[in-house]
Amino acid sequence: GTLTRKGRLFNPSVSPDGTMLAAVEYPVTGGSAIVILNPATGKVLRRRQMPDSLQAVEPRFMGNALIFNAISEGGSAIYRINAGLDGEPECLLGPVKVSIRNLNPVNDKVYFSSDRDGTQELYSINTESRKVFQHTSLPYGGDEFCFIGQDVIFSMLTKDGRLLHKAPALEMSGKEVDFNDIHQYRVADKLTMQERAFAALKCI
């Protein structure tokens, strides 16, 4: 049934112990907020309004904190705030004028996908050292990376269409990168990649 009766809530995330539900609220008046709800009743327990210059997107629980990505005039970034939603959000990465999405906290890292090098690839940031690693470099990129046990499932464009692939997580240990070093011709190269992919699809 319906858990909440009003509001515009998106991208829900459940805490590891199942006692809290986080979501992003986009009020009709504008702006954005992160809200913590009771997952059984839908009652709002806490609410944190974001600055007008920051649009929160995906909140994810990580220990006693919330990790969330946000968009501002400077680009995309990853922030951390305690689950009590008090204190100031701490910027872990960015802002950078690339996409950052599909956050997935695992132990002391946050995995995410980004088009930093021209195609969507899997990255991670160590929340303590702030080191960033690139874990994939696929011909046409990949997306919707999902960790299941010791494997990673993801969607990848091939000549046979957009297919799901599985790979051992250990094979994606990654290389450290400077996330601010953006592909100079990112947009043009991405369009070229897409054109090649569509051309390959037409040839089969």
Language-model regions, residue ranges each:
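Beta-strand-dominated lipid-handling architectures at cellular/organellar boundaries
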Residues: 30, 84-85, 104
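Structural motif
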Residues: 29-35, 74-80, 118-123, 160-167
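Outer-membrane beta-barrel initiation region
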Residues: 114, 162-163, 168-204
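Extended, hydrophobic interaction surfaces within ordered domains
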Residues: 133-179
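Conserved beta-propeller blade repeats
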Residues: 6-25, 48-69, 90-113, 134-153
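Short loop/turn segments that connect beta-strands within beta-propeller blades
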Residues: 38-42, 82-86, 126-130, 169-170
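Short polar/acidic secondary-structure junctions
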Residues: 26-28, 39, 71-72, 83, ...
